[in-house]
């Protein structure tokens, strides 16, 4: 049968809801340039790509390195999210930024296990992370992965930026400080 979680709306209702979502998203995220249509098109394509790959309110997923544009990296999350993508979400949709940071915070125990396995104290977020938080770096890249020690710093930097830009001190106190 049809899962109960599917909406009971008509096609027109779903289309209307979809259009309203995108109208709001573009109001919050659009950037307009003058003088070069190719630059404007490229900019909007990138903004659209960032908006469509987010999963609002779901802190059990992050954003893969290739988004929805390919199979590269098997859908795994990298530090690129915290450094390169999170600033967009902070400006356009802070709740999504919070969900992305919660993804990391909820995987703190896995990061602690990685650090302990390497003889270190604290937490070491993996270079290539699956939804479990475990290091899923392919064997061919394992040696490089061990040298990629900046990921925890990227996570801390992103948490600090989130708190500073949103003023959400409760989130920082409850999750950020420990992470």
Which residues fall in each region the model found?
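Residue-level recognition of alpha-helical structural elements
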Residues: 35, 39, 168-173
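Helix-terminus loop motifs that line ligand-binding clefts
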Residues: 54-69, 95-158, 163, 170-174
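Aromatic- and histidine-enriched alpha-helix N-cap/loop-to-helix transition segments
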Residues: 41, 75-82, 92, 147-154, ...
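Segments forming glycine/polar-rich beta-alpha architectures that bind adenosine-containing cofactors
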Residues: 67-76, 81-82, 86-87
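Well-ordered alpha-helical scaffold segments within catalytic/enzyme domains
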Residues: 27-32, 48-53, 83-94, 154-169
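Acidic/polar, glycine-enriched structural segments that form the non-catalytic walls/loops
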Residues: 1-73
